A protein has these predicted regions:
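Intrinsically disordered, low-complexity segments enriched in small/polar residues
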Residues: 8, 20, 36-38, 323, ...
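Low-complexity, intrinsically disordered or signal/transmembrane-proximal segments
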Residues: 7-11, 22, 38-40, 45-46
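Low-complexity intrinsically disordered segments
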Residues: 9-10, 24, 31, 50
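Generic detector of low-complexity/intrinsically disordered segments
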Residues: 27, 39, 43-44, 50, ...
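Positively charged, amphipathic and often flexible ligand-engagement surfaces
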Residues: 51-362
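Periodic, rod-like helical contexts
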Residues: 15, 21-22, 30-34, 38
Length: 362
């Protein structure tokens, strides 16, 4: 039965197949209803607000979007829908490297730097990992040739971490060496908690050899304060974010307030003792707290940078640049935009409302 916008959508409550043992549940529309549901929710913000009810906990909302990120049928529909592609172009620079460079040039003229992310997925063989390495080498070469800062972000599973640590290290080392040659930088994104130890080991080993590499730390993990202190002591640059993966309560704060409180505490620790920290958030209240702390502790505005996602909170981006803060945007590009898109909604469901607002303003 097709979904009727005049009536509430029917939903099924089912355990997430990947996290069943943690008793995490997802709310999912019937498969046949998804296209109509998306179109209607995008057209009617009031309906979406009703759909995202306040009594739905953050882990459930996160699991919902992560569930959608794995739905092949929805992905096929989204990637061929004119409306969905319109949304994607608002938050993804394009499918080609040249489109991403055009965005980077425009942002540079506005006083904003970027880190480019060539979107991809976990690889299943070493040939795919080598192809990902070669694609990123082309990105760094193109940034350098265009007179842009050479700065990229990447996920280790795209370079073979699940297959061979040594081969993953060799692949990423080529990128870090090239970035160092160009005076650039490679940021290693953090994935789910099972990857933290391997990711930190690889970053430490690369940093000891080349220096031009840093890592992401997620404030929703209990272990993150100890990791930040250790990275500060090793003079390794950290990007701080909240975290987007569905984690059990044994390793992560389940509540948003605790995640936010830990974020601010870690941001202050990075401002005090870190090496050019990158503070990634779209939360204006949190940004005000960071600004206040930096001012009261006489921390120069060029000693750290704010980071945001391309296409979100452009009003806040403009304000930060006008106030003399450094700002870098995370600019993704490539054909594999759908999983990225859904992970961003999982990370912060309020991004949905930024998307809706920007869609209807354009």
């Amino acid at each position: 039965m097709a979904w009727n916008p005049a009536q509430p959508a029917h939903h099924t409550i089912a355990p997430s197949p990947r996290k069943r043992r943690h008793n995490v549940f997802v709310i999912a529309p019937r498969a046949a209803e998804i296209p109509g549901l998306y179109v209607h929710l995008l057209a009617d913000q009031h309906s979406f607000e009703k759909f995202s009810m306040p009594d739905v906990t953050l882990p459930v909302v996160r699991s919902f979007f992560l569930f959608l990120s794995r739905r092949k049928m929805l992905r096929r529909w989204m990637e061929t829908s004119p409306l969905a592609r319109r949304l994607a172009t608002r938050f993804v620079a394009g499918e080609t490297l040249e489109q991403a460079l055009d965005v980077a040039r425009r942002l540079k003229s506005e006083g904003i730097t970027v880190t480019l992310d060539h979107l991809g997925e976990s690889v299943t063989n070493l040939e795919e990992a080598s192809a990902a390495r070669d694609a990123y080498l082309r990105v760094l070469d193109a940034q350098h040739a265009a007179g842009l800062e050479c700065n990229v972000s990447l996920k280790l599973t795209q370079f073979g971490l699940d297959i061979s640590y040594d081969q993953c290290f060799a692949n990423v080392e080529q990128l870090v060496a090239k970035a160092a040659q160009f005076g650039g930088f490679v940021r290693v994104d953090m994935e789910s908690s099972e990857y933290v130890d391997r990711t930190l080991k690889l970053v430490r080993d690369l940093h000891a050899r080349h220096g031009a590499v840093g890592v992401v730390i997620q404030s929703y993990l209990f272990r993150s304060r100890a990791d930040v202190e250790s990275l500060n002591a090793a003079h390794i640059r950290v990007r701080l974010c909240k975290g987007a993966y569905l984690e059990p309560a044994t390793v992560a704060f389940p509540g948003k307030r605790d995640v936010d409180r830990n974020y601010v505490d870690l941001a202050n620790l990075l401002l005090d003792r870190g090496v050019y920290p990158a503070l990634a958030t779209h939360d204006e209240q949190m940004i005000r707290q960071i600004e206040s702390y930096a001012t009261s502790h006489k921390i120069a505005r060029d000693a750290f940078e704010f980071q945001m996602l391309y296409g979100i909170r452009r009003d806040l981006q403009t304000r930060l640049v006008a106030d003399g803060y450094r700002l870098r945007l995370y600019v993704p590009f490539g054909r594999a935009w759908y999983p990225y898109y859904m992970r961003r909604l999982a990370e912060r469901p309020a991004n949905v409302f930024f998307i809706l607002r920007n869609l209807f303003r354009s």
